Amino acid sequence: MKNIYIVAGFFVVLVQGSWQHSLQDTEEKSRSFPASQTDPLEDPDQINEDKRHSQGTFTSDYSKYLDSRRAQDFVQWLMNTKRNRNNIAKRHDEFERHAEGTFTSDVSSYLEGQAAKEFIAWLVKGRGRRDFPEEVTIVEELGRRHADGSFSDEMNTILDSLATRDFINWLIQTKITDKK
C-alpha cells in the first residue's frame, strides 16, 4: 500500500515538472516573437506570481494528503499494538467481533471450557444421577445478556438447554448392554 502512495507521489512530481517545463517553453517562445505596438506587454512579476500560486496550491494539497496519510498510519499502528501488546497466540475467534458488534469475553470462554471439562470428567467417572434444578437454569438463561445489552434469543436457548438436559438424563438412566 505504501508503495502505491510512493509511486503516486513520484507521478505527481513528474507531472508538476512537466507543467513547469511547458510553461517555461511557452514563455521563451512568446519572448522570441516581437510584440506589436498594440499588444500590452506581459509583466514578468505577474507570471512569477501565477507560477508561485500553482506551486503553492500543489504543495498545500500534497501536505494535506501527507498529514492525512500519517494520521491513518498512526491509527493503524495503535490498533496493531493494542491487538499484539501481550504477544499471546490467540485463537482465530478470540477478540473478533460478533455480528452484533460485541466482543467475546475471555473469562466466560475460560469458565465455559472449565465447566465442559468438569462435565466430561463427571460423565467418564459414571457417577449417579445428577439433578438439574429447572427453575435455576431457566432463570439463568433468561438473565443472560450480550455485552452490548441486547438479549440473546431466549426461547432457543431454553429449548436447547431442556433438550440437552433430557438427553443427558436419558444417557445416565439407560443401561449399557454389551452385545457379544
UniProtKB/Swiss-Prot annotation:
The modification Arginine amide is found at residue 127. Induction: Glucagon release is stimulated by hypoglycemia and inhibited by hyperglycemia, insulin, and somatostatin. GLP-1 and GLP-2 are induced in response to nutrient ingestion. It is found in: Secreted. The keyword Ligase does not apply. Residues 25-59 are annotated as: Disordered. InterPro entries: Glucagon, Glucagon_GIP_secretin_VIP. Proglucagon is post-translationally processed in a tissue-specific manner in pancreatic A cells and intestinal L cells. In pancreatic A cells, the major bioactive hormone is glucagon cleaved by PCSK2/PC2. In the intestinal L cells PCSK1/PC1 liberates GLP-1, GLP-2, glicentin and oxyntomodulin. GLP-1 is further N-terminally truncated by post-translational processing in the intestinal L cells resulting in GLP-1(7-37) GLP-1-(7-36)amide. The C-terminal amidation is neither important for the metabolism of GLP-1 nor for its effects on the endocrine pancreas. One of its GO terms (biological process) is glucose homeostasis. One of its GO terms (molecular function) is hormone activity. GO terms for cellular component: extracellular space. The modification Phosphoserine is found at residues 54, 105, 108, 150, 152. Residues 1-20 form the signal peptide. Transmembrane segments: none annotated. The record marks 52-53, 83-84, 91-92, 97-98, 130-131, 145-146 as: Cleavage. This is Pro-glucagon. It comes from Mesocricetus auratus.
